[in-house]
Amino acid sequence: MMKDIIPASSWASEESTDLQNGSFPLSVAPRSEFPRRRALEDWLLSVFLADQAESEGQLVLERVRDTPPPVTSPRGDGICVSRGKAPSSPGGSTHAWLYLTRHFPWSPFPHGGWTDTSEPCVLETLGGSSLAALRGNSLWVQSSGACAFCVYESLIEQSLPNERFEELLLGPSPGEVMK
């Protein structure tokens, strides 16, 4: 199934200031406007609702009501990918997907389970405690506070041909499907 690629220029202009200031509003958009994408410096940032995400290499952001211990930010080699506010949920859990095409694949996650500051993926919250869990290719986030977040990735420099990037974003070409 082909995905609809939305160019960054099609996003609402008022969001550009929020993004430059480090915030990324997810809750203001109706479902029909997902997936959403924006170029951020040399990154292409895509936001999916959880039930829309299909490709590998995606980050899962999930807010839950549990109160885990805090996590400190990484020292030195972390790369700040994005910052934003997760949408609120009366049921205590919401999902959004962040998808970054700058590096593929992600550094291999060492194991499933909860992270600590020695792991390659660490989550830092602003105004609330949080904990990140690595499961497969997904980073699961728990937050008990305001659920503003920064995701840091220690990435291995790897690249794939443009055709592979397109396949990850769009799925295989019709010719590939018929083979």
UniProtKB/Swiss-Prot annotation:
Residues 10-20 have a biased composition (Polar residues). Residues 1-20, 65-86 are annotated as: Disordered. This is B-cell acute lymphoblastic leukemia-expressed protein. It comes from Homo sapiens (Human). The lineage of its organism: Eukaryota, Metazoa, Chordata, Craniata, Vertebrata.
